[in-house]
Amino acid sequence: MTEPLLTIDDLAVSYRARRERRTALEGLSLELGRGEVLALVGESGSGKSTTAQSIIGLLPEGGRIDRGSIALRLAGGPIDLARLEGRALEDIRGRRVALVPQDPGTSLNPVQTIGASVAAPLRIHRWGRPEAIRRRVVELLDRVGLDDPERRARQHPHELSGGMRQRALIAAAIALEPELIIADEPTSALDVTVQRRILDLLDDLRGELGSSVLLITHDLAVAAERADAIAVLRGGRLEEAGPTRAVLEQPASRYTATLLADAPALADESPRVPRPPAAPFVVVERLVHEYGRGADAHRAVDDVGFGIERGTTHALVGESGSGKTTIGRAVAGFHAPSAGGIRIGHRDVVAARRDRSLRRVVQLVSQNPFASLDPRRTVAQSIGEPLQNLGAPDGRRLDRRELASRVSAAIAHVALPPDAGDRLPRELSGGQRQRVAIARALIIEPAVVVLDEAVSALDVTVQAQILALLERLQGELGLTYLFITHDLAVVRRIADTVTVLRQGRVVETGTAEQVLLRPRHDYTRALLDAVPSPDWLRTPSAAGIDPTPLEVA
């Protein structure tokens, strides 16, 4: 390791939880070298984000540093960030230490222009006059690869794609050329090609600025490909730390070995063996969906068709803006397409879209269960709500005792603890909330489940558990899945058949084995090449194609 820029020594952090305090970090000690990347890896609740918040002085209400030090070594000598407060902390934040948060959708002010958001650290630190700041903002947006930066500076967040918004956050973070950049899950919600561009950008900027990067991630493949060193956290404690190759080649901790085993990878076992052909149960025919009208119309889905056999999993794969979610919501009956048809068995989904009975046939599980669950209702109330609204699968209205019995059975079916029904969503982990969303979808015994990025935000261990759960339920209940994802390693594990989308059109479709092992289209090959490899010895090869133009909004 080079001379350390950041040294964390015996850090302990706790949060107020009702009438007691809950320990979030206990005795954490780490070092990050100058100009290096340290990946902080662990599952949800391991303390990764708490570590970042402690460094930058942004612990949420009720959080406090109980002991330990966080030494940032600057030219004038080391500064203990754990002891800073008020103006002294504000002077460091943004100027010496900057944060790239996970979700640009919530981190950018929706009523502010992109230019105003990028300019915020420059204004706070009185970098220059308004005209000089305006020029600096345009320069920064250009530096992070946004086309037509002057126009982008005038736009609002909703006018940019997810990758473009993430670039804007990076522009704000590097505005004052800080010594330390904390990247908190900066690519977990992005598709593989945009993810690669964002990580390449961070690498380039690190080289230009000489900054160190603390990369917080649950993706071991990203850590393996990008980090000089890895630190593994579990339950607020450090499991192990060391050079990337040493940690991944010879993990000292059984927990690290488990994380490595759970990480989905294209190099893992072969895709599912193709089944003998059968008549499709779900049929999507020449689907078209347009947003807006007239000259402002945007065709998000253009002549898409595919079929799904009963009891199988069909994956829809593509970048942001490829039309995946639009198709999934149409199959679930949430909106009518502009043209084309959708059938489930003998039922016309488009014609039956407003029929409540369609909800018995097809259910949707979304990416963010926290947003889809009522925060004021208990888990049992949320799971039981579809039964209360629609009745039992045979149409009967259930009395309170039978409803409670079915909810308890649903909770057990998705392997949640028996007392989970009495909890609120905020009292559950991310993986537990996703299990609640699955139980809620399955309690009325649908034939088809649309899973829209249902595991993309979960750490590898929880992701593996949810995928195993979905496979078990499919085998027990004969479910048919439409699985929407940007993660090709997950597709390899769970899908029987695959359709690859690009800008609303089908690029290719076939069995998982055909598409993943023998892709016919350059775009599919480029998507496969962009997947971070968990093999830390692999040198990424160039596919010779840029899968899409730079994120176009």
Describe these PLM feature segments.
Residues G94, H158, L176, I444:
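Conserved signature/switch motifs of ABC ATPase nucleotide-binding domains
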Residues Q155-L160, M164, L424-L428, Q432:
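Conserved ABC ATPase signature
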Residues A168, I174-A175, L442:
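ABC ATPase C-loop
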Residues A132-R151, R401-D419:
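Conserved ABC ATPase "signature" region
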Residues I56, P60, A332:
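Helix-to-loop junction immediately C-terminal to a conserved catalytic motif
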Residues I65-I79, G340-D348, L358:
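Conserved ABC transporter NBD signature motif
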Residues L238-G242, Q250, V506-G510:
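ABC ATPase "signature
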Residues G77-A98, I124, A246-P251, G294-H298, ...:
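ABC ATPase NBD coupling module
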